[in-house]
Amino acid sequence: MTIVLNPKKPLSVNPLKMSQPLGASLAFLGLKGMMPLFHGAQGCTAFAKVVLVRHFRESIPLSTTAMTEVSTILGGQDHVEQAILTIVDKNKPEIIGLLTTGLTETRGDDMEGILKDIRQKHPQLKNLPIVFVSTPDYKGSLQDGYAATVEQIVATDYNAFIAENARSAVIYPQPQVTVLAGSSLSPGDIQEIKSIIEAFGLMPLVIPDLSRSLDGHLEDGYQSITGGGTTLPQLRSLPHSCYTLAIGESMRGAAEILKDRFGTNYEVFPRLAGLEAVDTFLWRLSQIVTSRCDHHFPIVPNIPALFERQRRQLQDAILDTHFYFGGKKVALALEPDLLHQTAWLLTEMGAKIQAAVTTTKSPLLEDLPVDTVTIGDLEDLEDLSAGVDLIITNSHGTAMAQRLNAPLYRMGYPVFDQLGNGQRCLVGYRGTIQFLFDVGNILLAEEANHNHQLSVGVHVT
């Protein structure tokens, strides 16, 4: 069992973690017609917007209640009310995601009571879903805020907000499965998961669906709210799902809520990268098709041939790359779900995890292929990473990698010095292949550079 270390440092040096409000806004951005609303100072929203814009290189719709020193002392109900009314008037959202920040959490605003009063005061808000989530940024991390938001999304009764001429629910002829997509998944990852599920004749209902909002596509015109994502009719069809697939341990809580509300059985998949992990996922899908759902149409009883070929391609990629992974020392600094997936995949390839640093507590931390994992910052990682062959973390690790004279593979949030983050896919057979080739090429280049330096040294001598 891995020992989890949580040193009591008086400050964070070269921070690793992103805040809960950032994670919450990311989850909200996976819903169509959404406007995330930060209840806090303007700077809180500006920070999240800058991080997300730099990472995805897309327009990010965020709004704020713009709390000031005076309103923080006297109370922020008027600011929340005015912000909601302004958003409704100017942006015409289908849904609003209201999240708190450290400022308003410290004050202790009664947000449920505030929303109730606002609805009573303004009947025009009767049919507008407003999903509230508590996300203090002085504790937890991006993954915590994201998970809490998904839990609130699936806990909300959207049938209570049906306007005239609105669609109550989407009913598909195929069996529907709910997919709870964790914060470790990129829009490209989610698209790959959807394609895999659809190949089995199932209809995936992804929450939140970033593959429809932050995948990097041109809209016909300017969008002041999210132009894609999980729709309200899809959210109303949650009771019709025959199974829930939770991708990432952090999605277990949301899966439990769906089971309690609708009796939908679920399974948690801690990772979807690596031969064994993807095999397990595909096997479960085949079992859902053949035994879990009511089906009245031709179905695919076994694993589609497409994935048999992809599996063989992954086996070949493993053979091609394992020479460069074997015995390599790797340092990781990632959110828990992503750390677990990456650490096990590297270990399966023969690499050794020399250092592991993460942002928050998780049951997965006790099941890592490493003796200890530290809940800390990038300074902790640097102290543990002397002599490593590879560092995997976000773009904030660039200077550290240069000081350690080790290559950096960018992963997590934010990645602001690399293009294509919205399309990047590292799950499934194809995503695993891409990861192995990406990292393998880095290690191959380092080995070639090292051999060149040795040959130059011998020649000079």
Swiss-Prot record:
SUPFAM superfamilies: Helical backbone' metal receptor (SSF53807). One of its GO terms (molecular function) is nitrogenase activity. Signal peptide: none annotated. Gene3D superfamilies: 6.10.250.1090, Nitrogenase molybdenum iron protein domain (3.40.50.1980). Keywords: Nitrogen fixation. CDD domains: Nitrogenase_NifN_1. Pathway: Cofactor biosynthesis; Fe-Mo cofactor biosynthesis. GO terms for biological process: nitrogen fixation; protein-containing complex assembly. InterPro entries: ChlB/BchB/BchZ, Nase/OxRdtase_comp1, Nase_comp1_CS, Nase_Mo-Fe_CF. Belongs to the NifD/NifK/NifE/NifN family. This protein may play a role in the biosynthesis of the prosthetic group of nitrogenase (FeMo cofactor). NCBIfam families: nifN. This is Nitrogenase iron-molybdenum cofactor biosynthesis protein NifN. It comes from Rippkaea orientalis (strain PCC 8801 / RF-1) (Cyanothece sp. (strain PCC 8801)).
